[in-house]
Amino acid sequence: MMALLQRVTRARVTVDGATTGEIGTGLLALVCAEQGDTEAEADKLLAKLLKLRVFADEGGRMNRSLQEVGGGLLVVSQFTLAADTSGGNRPSFANAAPADTGRALYEHFVARARAQHGEVATGRFGAMMQVELVNDGPVTIPLRIPPASAA
């Protein structure tokens, strides 16, 4: 399972003109389930995300986690993170989990995030979404927990 994290001062996702999720300071996590992923990979990814030290401490060093700063978490499903662009000019998404598996893992990830962290907002799985953000830094970090079958 993978995520592209962006440290933000604010972020919002809308579907059909209606806001489905919005946060202030925190992390925007674009999340993708890959072929072979299970809840175990989702849990490991979430644990890493919540503890990743990407926020400044008193000295200005990236030394504090999302949990430590009490920031928001906006989780948006994005299967295109699994794109394979090695052949030709059209990306292949064959590495992404099937839609039903992707939805189940996304919902599991969000449920666990809500159980472990205070402020969690989301997009809508499978919808055409517009994501607005102000990237702070900019800080953008890819995370990937490979499926156990690929290890």
Swiss-Prot record:
Provide the primary localization.
Answer: cytoplasm
Q: Which SUPFAM superfamilies match?
A: DTD-like (SSF69500)
Which NCBIfam families has this protein been placed in?
D-aminoacyl-tRNA deacylase
Which Pfam families is this protein grouped with?
Answer: Tyr_Deacylase
**Into which EC class is this enzyme placed?**
hydrolase
What subcellular locations does the record give? Cytoplasm
Q: How does it assemble?
A: Homodimer.
Q: Which GO terms describe its biological process?
A: D-amino acid catabolic process
Sorted keywords for this record are: Cytoplasm, Hydrolase, RNA-binding, tRNA-binding
Q: What is known of its domains?
A: A Gly-cisPro motif from one monomer fits into the active site of the other monomer to allow specific chiral rejection of L-amino acids.
Q: What family does the Swiss-Prot or TrEMBL record give for this protein?
A: Belongs to the DTD family.
Matching PANTHER family, A to Z? D-AMINOACYL-TRNA DEACYLASE 1, D-TYROSYL-TRNA TYR DEACYLASE
Question: What function does the entry list?
Answer: An aminoacyl-tRNA editing enzyme that deacylates mischarged D-aminoacyl-tRNAs. Also deacylates mischarged glycyl-tRNA(Ala), protecting cells against glycine mischarging by AlaRS. Acts via tRNA-based rather than protein-based catalysis; rejects L-amino acids rather than detecting D-amino acids in the active site. By recycling D-aminoacyl-tRNA to D-amino acids and free tRNA molecules, this enzyme counteracts the toxicity associated with the formation of D-aminoacyl-tRNA entities in vivo and helps enforce protein L-homochirality.
In chain numbering, motif Gly-cisPro motif, important for rejection of L-amino acids lies across 137-138
What name does this protein carry? D-aminoacyl-tRNA deacylase
Picking any one GO molecular function of the record gives: Gly-tRNA(Ala) deacylase activity
Please give an example of a GO cellular component term from this record: cytoplasm
Q: What is its EC number?
A: 3.1.1.96
Q: Which reaction does it catalyse?
A: glycyl-tRNA(Ala) + H2O = tRNA(Ala) + glycine + H(+); a D-aminoacyl-tRNA + H2O = a tRNA + a D-alpha-amino acid + H(+)
